[in-house]
Protein backbone atom coordinates (compact mmCIF):
# COMPACT_ATOMS: atom_id res chain seq x y z
CA UNK A 1 0.00 0.00 0.00
CA UNK A 2 1.54 3.27 -1.09
CA UNK A 3 2.40 5.89 1.47
CA UNK A 4 -0.03 8.80 1.43
CA UNK A 5 0.16 12.15 3.15
CA UNK A 6 -2.94 14.11 4.06
CA UNK A 7 -3.94 16.80 6.47
CA UNK A 8 -4.72 15.30 9.87
CA UNK A 9 -8.50 15.39 10.20
CA UNK A 10 -8.50 13.33 13.39
CA UNK A 11 -8.73 14.60 16.95
CA UNK A 12 -5.87 14.01 19.39
CA UNK A 13 -6.26 13.45 23.09
CA UNK A 14 -3.86 14.57 25.79
CA UNK A 15 -5.66 12.58 28.47
CA UNK A 16 -5.36 8.84 28.98
CA UNK A 17 -6.70 6.23 28.90
CA UNK A 18 -8.65 6.84 25.71
CA UNK A 19 -11.72 4.76 24.85
CA UNK A 20 -13.42 4.91 21.45
CA UNK A 21 -16.52 2.84 20.66
CA UNK A 22 -19.27 2.44 18.10
CA UNK A 23 -22.67 4.13 18.36
CA UNK A 24 -24.18 6.32 21.06
CA UNK A 25 -24.74 3.40 23.41
CA UNK A 26 -20.97 2.99 23.40
CA UNK A 27 -20.75 5.88 25.85
CA UNK A 28 -21.98 3.63 28.68
CA UNK A 29 -19.48 1.01 27.54
CA UNK A 30 -16.67 3.56 27.63
CA UNK A 31 -17.67 4.90 31.03
CA UNK A 32 -17.56 1.43 32.58
CA UNK A 33 -14.22 0.75 30.92
CA UNK A 34 -12.79 3.98 32.36
CA UNK A 35 -14.18 3.21 35.81
CA UNK A 36 -12.61 -0.25 35.70
CA UNK A 37 -9.23 1.08 34.59
CA UNK A 38 -9.22 3.74 37.30
CA UNK A 39 -9.72 0.98 39.88
CA UNK A 40 -6.26 -0.30 38.98
CA UNK A 41 -7.32 -2.98 36.52
CA UNK A 42 -5.60 -3.63 33.20
CA UNK A 43 -6.60 -2.12 29.87
CA UNK A 44 -7.84 -5.56 28.79
CA UNK A 45 -9.93 -5.80 31.97
CA UNK A 46 -11.41 -2.42 31.11
CA UNK A 47 -12.34 -3.51 27.59
CA UNK A 48 -14.01 -6.67 28.85
CA UNK A 49 -15.91 -4.87 31.62
CA UNK A 50 -17.11 -2.15 29.28
CA UNK A 51 -18.45 -4.54 26.67
CA UNK A 52 -20.18 -6.63 29.33
CA UNK A 53 -22.35 -3.58 30.11
CA UNK A 54 -23.73 -3.56 26.58
CA UNK A 55 -24.12 -7.34 26.52
CA UNK A 56 -26.29 -7.11 29.65
CA UNK A 57 -28.52 -4.32 28.31
CA UNK A 58 -31.77 -6.05 27.35
CA UNK A 59 -32.99 -2.90 25.58
CA UNK A 60 -30.22 -3.28 23.01
CA UNK A 61 -31.52 -5.49 20.21
CA UNK A 62 -28.14 -6.19 18.69
CA UNK A 63 -25.83 -7.33 21.49
CA UNK A 64 -26.06 -10.01 24.17
CA UNK A 65 -29.22 -10.61 26.17
CA UNK A 66 -32.21 -9.32 24.22
CA UNK A 67 -30.46 -9.58 20.87
CA UNK A 68 -32.57 -10.35 17.81
CA UNK A 69 -32.62 -14.13 17.23
CA UNK A 70 -31.81 -16.06 14.08
CA UNK A 71 -34.39 -17.49 11.68
CA UNK A 72 -35.08 -20.38 14.06
CA UNK A 73 -35.76 -18.03 16.98
CA UNK A 74 -32.44 -18.72 18.70
CA UNK A 75 -30.04 -15.99 19.80
CA UNK A 76 -26.49 -16.74 18.61
CA UNK A 77 -23.70 -14.41 19.67
CA UNK A 78 -20.27 -13.50 18.25
CA UNK A 79 -17.40 -11.73 20.03
CA UNK A 80 -13.66 -11.21 20.02
CA UNK A 81 -11.04 -9.58 22.21
CA UNK A 82 -7.49 -8.57 21.33
CA UNK A 83 -4.45 -7.59 23.40
CA UNK A 84 -2.12 -5.35 21.44
CA UNK A 85 1.20 -5.71 23.31
CA UNK A 86 1.30 -9.50 22.90
CA UNK A 87 -0.83 -9.63 19.73
CA UNK A 88 -3.03 -12.22 21.43
CA UNK A 89 -6.62 -12.78 20.45
CA UNK A 90 -9.61 -14.89 21.36
CA UNK A 91 -13.02 -15.15 19.76
CA UNK A 92 -16.27 -17.09 19.82
CA UNK A 93 -18.84 -17.47 17.07
CA UNK A 94 -22.48 -18.58 17.01
CA UNK A 95 -22.42 -19.30 20.74
CA UNK A 96 -25.80 -19.89 22.39
CA UNK A 97 -27.04 -19.54 25.96
CA UNK A 98 -24.08 -17.56 27.34
CA UNK A 99 -24.68 -13.95 28.39
CA UNK A 100 -21.14 -12.61 28.02
CA UNK A 101 -19.37 -13.90 24.91
CA UNK A 102 -16.66 -11.24 25.35
CA UNK A 103 -15.59 -12.99 28.56
CA UNK A 104 -15.65 -16.40 26.88
CA UNK A 105 -13.50 -14.98 24.07
CA UNK A 106 -10.98 -13.82 26.65
CA UNK A 107 -10.91 -17.30 28.17
CA UNK A 108 -10.25 -18.76 24.72
CA UNK A 109 -7.30 -16.38 24.41
CA UNK A 110 -5.89 -17.06 27.86
CA UNK A 111 -6.74 -20.71 28.51
CA UNK A 112 -6.40 -22.41 25.12
CA UNK A 113 -3.90 -22.54 22.24
CA UNK A 114 -6.71 -21.56 19.86
CA UNK A 115 -7.99 -18.29 18.46
CA UNK A 116 -11.65 -19.14 17.85
CA UNK A 117 -14.26 -21.58 19.13
CA UNK A 118 -17.69 -21.84 17.52
CA UNK A 119 -21.17 -23.20 18.10
CA UNK A 120 -21.61 -26.14 20.45
CA UNK A 121 -17.87 -26.33 21.08
CA UNK A 122 -17.79 -22.72 22.24
CA UNK A 123 -20.75 -23.29 24.55
CA UNK A 124 -19.24 -26.46 26.03
CA UNK A 125 -15.97 -24.64 26.66
CA UNK A 126 -17.82 -21.78 28.35
CA UNK A 127 -19.74 -24.15 30.63
CA UNK A 128 -16.52 -26.00 31.47
CA UNK A 129 -14.99 -22.64 32.44
CA UNK A 130 -17.82 -21.96 34.88
CA UNK A 131 -20.09 -19.73 32.82
CA UNK A 132 -23.79 -20.23 33.50
CA UNK A 133 -26.50 -20.96 30.95
CA UNK A 134 -28.69 -17.91 30.36
CA UNK A 135 -31.90 -17.44 28.41
CA UNK A 136 -30.91 -14.77 25.89
CA UNK A 137 -34.30 -14.48 24.19
CA UNK A 138 -36.51 -11.88 25.86
CA UNK A 139 -40.28 -11.97 25.56
CA UNK A 140 -40.22 -8.86 23.37
CA UNK A 141 -37.78 -10.40 20.89
CA UNK A 142 -39.70 -13.67 20.92
CA UNK A 143 -42.95 -11.94 20.00
CA UNK A 144 -41.19 -10.01 17.24
CA UNK A 145 -39.74 -13.24 15.89
CA UNK A 146 -43.15 -14.97 15.95
CA UNK A 147 -44.67 -12.12 13.95
CA UNK A 148 -41.80 -12.28 11.47
CA UNK A 149 -42.09 -16.07 11.22
CA UNK A 150 -45.76 -15.81 10.21
CA UNK A 151 -44.90 -13.82 7.10
CA UNK A 152 -44.96 -15.67 3.79
CA UNK A 153 -41.94 -13.70 2.60
CA UNK A 154 -39.34 -13.72 5.33
CA UNK A 155 -36.71 -11.03 4.99
CA UNK A 156 -33.73 -10.36 7.21
CA UNK A 157 -34.27 -7.70 9.85
CA UNK A 158 -33.53 -4.27 8.38
CA UNK A 159 -32.74 -2.33 11.56
CA UNK A 160 -31.04 -2.56 14.96
CA UNK A 161 -27.98 -4.60 14.03
CA UNK A 162 -25.42 -2.61 15.97
CA UNK A 163 -22.15 -4.18 17.00
CA UNK A 164 -20.41 -2.78 20.07
CA UNK A 165 -16.75 -2.32 19.25
CA UNK A 166 -14.41 -0.77 21.82
CA UNK A 167 -10.84 0.42 21.22
CA UNK A 168 -8.65 1.40 24.18
CA UNK A 169 -5.29 3.18 24.44
CA UNK A 170 -3.21 3.87 27.56
CA UNK A 171 -0.51 6.46 28.26
CA UNK A 172 2.21 3.99 27.26
CA UNK A 173 0.76 3.65 23.78
CA UNK A 174 -0.51 0.12 24.40
CA UNK A 175 -3.80 -0.85 22.78
CA UNK A 176 -6.55 -3.36 23.52
CA UNK A 177 -9.96 -3.87 21.95
CA UNK A 178 -13.00 -6.05 21.63
CA UNK A 179 -16.38 -6.38 19.97
CA UNK A 180 -19.61 -8.25 20.57
CA UNK A 181 -22.89 -8.72 18.70
CA UNK A 182 -25.95 -10.87 18.18
CA UNK A 183 -25.50 -10.21 14.48
CA UNK A 184 -27.92 -9.87 11.62
CA UNK A 185 -31.47 -10.28 12.88
CA UNK A 186 -33.23 -13.43 11.58
CA UNK A 187 -29.99 -14.61 9.97
CA UNK A 188 -29.60 -18.22 8.87
CA UNK A 189 -28.63 -20.43 11.84
CA UNK A 190 -24.86 -20.68 12.09
CA UNK A 191 -24.20 -17.44 10.24
CA UNK A 192 -21.09 -15.73 11.59
CA UNK A 193 -20.55 -12.02 11.15
CA UNK A 194 -17.42 -9.92 11.16
CA UNK A 195 -17.30 -9.29 14.91
CA UNK A 196 -15.27 -12.40 15.84
CA UNK A 197 -13.09 -12.19 12.72
CA UNK A 198 -9.68 -10.63 13.34
CA UNK A 199 -8.99 -8.17 10.55
CA UNK A 200 -12.70 -7.96 9.78
CA UNK A 201 -14.56 -6.54 12.76
CA UNK A 202 -11.42 -5.65 14.75
CA UNK A 203 -7.70 -5.34 14.22
CA UNK A 204 -4.88 -4.04 16.41
CA UNK A 205 -1.23 -3.51 15.62
CA UNK A 206 0.35 -2.18 18.80
CA UNK A 207 3.05 -0.39 16.79
CA UNK A 208 0.48 1.48 14.71
CA UNK A 209 -3.08 1.63 16.01
CA UNK A 210 -6.45 -0.09 15.98
CA UNK A 211 -9.64 -0.09 13.96
CA UNK A 212 -13.12 -1.52 14.23
CA UNK A 213 -15.56 -2.10 11.40
CA UNK A 214 -19.32 -2.24 11.75
CA UNK A 215 -22.15 -2.38 9.27
CA UNK A 216 -23.20 -5.41 7.28
CA UNK A 217 -20.73 -8.02 8.49
CA UNK A 218 -20.35 -9.66 5.12
CA UNK A 219 -19.00 -6.38 3.74
CA UNK A 220 -16.50 -6.04 6.58
CA UNK A 221 -15.26 -9.61 6.13
CA UNK A 222 -14.95 -9.61 2.35
CA UNK A 223 -12.47 -6.76 2.42
CA UNK A 224 -10.54 -7.49 5.67
CA UNK A 225 -11.74 -4.00 6.46
CA UNK A 226 -10.27 -3.24 9.89
CA UNK A 227 -6.90 -4.54 8.77
CA UNK A 228 -7.08 -2.23 5.75
CA UNK A 229 -7.70 0.81 7.98
CA UNK A 230 -4.71 -0.04 10.17
CA UNK A 231 -2.53 -0.47 7.09
CA UNK A 232 -3.58 2.96 5.84
CA UNK A 233 -2.50 4.36 9.21
CA UNK A 234 0.80 2.52 8.85
CA UNK A 235 1.26 4.27 5.50
CA UNK A 236 1.00 7.66 7.21
CA UNK A 237 -2.69 8.56 7.31
CA UNK A 238 -4.32 9.80 10.48
CA UNK A 239 -7.17 7.60 11.81
CA UNK A 240 -10.09 9.47 10.25
CA UNK A 241 -8.35 9.80 6.89
CA UNK A 242 -7.54 6.08 7.06
CA UNK A 243 -11.22 5.27 7.63
CA UNK A 244 -12.21 7.41 4.64
CA UNK A 245 -9.50 5.87 2.47
CA UNK A 246 -10.68 2.36 3.35
CA UNK A 247 -14.28 3.22 2.46
CA UNK A 248 -13.24 4.70 -0.88
CA UNK A 249 -11.01 1.75 -1.68
CA UNK A 250 -13.79 -0.73 -0.91
CA UNK A 251 -16.40 1.32 -2.79
CA UNK A 252 -14.15 1.39 -5.86
CA UNK A 253 -14.35 -2.42 -5.99
CA UNK A 254 -17.79 -3.29 -4.65
CA UNK A 255 -20.79 -3.26 -7.03
CA UNK A 256 -22.77 -1.29 -4.44
CA UNK A 257 -20.15 1.43 -4.35
CA UNK A 258 -21.02 4.06 -1.75
CA UNK A 259 -24.37 2.38 -1.06
CA UNK A 260 -22.48 -0.20 0.96
CA UNK A 261 -23.29 -0.46 4.68
CA UNK A 262 -19.89 -0.04 6.31
CA UNK A 263 -18.59 2.18 9.14
CA UNK A 264 -15.25 2.52 10.92
CA UNK A 265 -13.71 3.79 14.13
CA UNK A 266 -9.96 4.03 14.56
CA UNK A 267 -7.20 5.33 16.82
CA UNK A 268 -3.43 5.41 16.59
CA UNK A 269 -0.83 4.95 19.29
CA UNK A 270 -0.22 8.72 19.48
CA UNK A 271 -3.77 9.32 20.71
CA UNK A 272 -5.35 10.48 17.46
CA UNK A 273 -8.83 9.09 16.80
CA UNK A 274 -11.57 9.38 14.21
CA UNK A 275 -14.40 7.65 12.39
CA UNK A 276 -16.16 7.55 9.05
CA UNK A 277 -19.18 5.86 7.53
CA UNK A 278 -21.02 5.54 4.26
CA UNK A 279 -23.68 8.21 4.59
CA UNK A 280 -24.68 10.37 7.53
CA UNK A 281 -25.76 9.19 10.95
CA UNK A 282 -23.01 6.89 12.18
CA UNK A 283 -22.22 7.89 15.75
CA UNK A 284 -19.27 6.99 17.93
CA UNK A 285 -18.40 7.60 21.57
CA UNK A 286 -15.11 8.92 22.94
CA UNK A 287 -14.17 8.89 26.61
CA UNK A 288 -11.13 10.06 28.58
CA UNK A 289 -10.73 10.93 32.28
CA UNK A 290 -11.80 14.50 31.48
CA UNK A 291 -14.73 13.98 29.11
CA UNK A 292 -17.19 11.50 27.61
CA UNK A 293 -18.93 12.48 24.38
CA UNK A 294 -20.83 11.14 21.37
CA UNK A 295 -19.79 12.39 17.92
CA UNK A 296 -21.16 12.18 14.40
CA UNK A 297 -18.67 10.50 12.11
CA UNK A 298 -17.38 11.84 8.83
CA UNK A 299 -19.90 10.95 6.10
CA UNK A 300 -18.63 9.54 2.82
CA UNK A 301 -21.15 9.61 -0.02
CA UNK A 302 -24.85 10.36 0.24
CA UNK A 303 -27.62 8.66 2.13
CA UNK A 304 -27.95 8.21 5.85
CA UNK A 305 -28.38 5.69 8.60
CA UNK A 306 -30.51 6.28 11.67
CA UNK A 307 -28.72 6.65 14.98
CA UNK A 308 -27.70 3.14 15.95
CA UNK A 309 -29.11 1.62 12.80
CA UNK A 310 -28.32 0.12 9.45
CA UNK A 311 -25.65 -2.08 10.94
CA UNK A 312 -25.30 -5.85 10.95
Language model region names:
Residues 2-312:
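Alpha/propeptide regions of enzymes that mature by internal proteolysis
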Amino acid sequence: MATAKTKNHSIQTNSYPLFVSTWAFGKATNNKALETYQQGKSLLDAVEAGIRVTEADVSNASVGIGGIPNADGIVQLDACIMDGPDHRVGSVAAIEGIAHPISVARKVMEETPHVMLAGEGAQKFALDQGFQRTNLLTQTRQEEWKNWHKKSRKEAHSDAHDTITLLALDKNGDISGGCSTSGWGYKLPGRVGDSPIIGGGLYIDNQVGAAGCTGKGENCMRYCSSFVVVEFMRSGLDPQSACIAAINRIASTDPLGLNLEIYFIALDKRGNYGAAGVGKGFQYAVTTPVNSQVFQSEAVGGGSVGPEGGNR
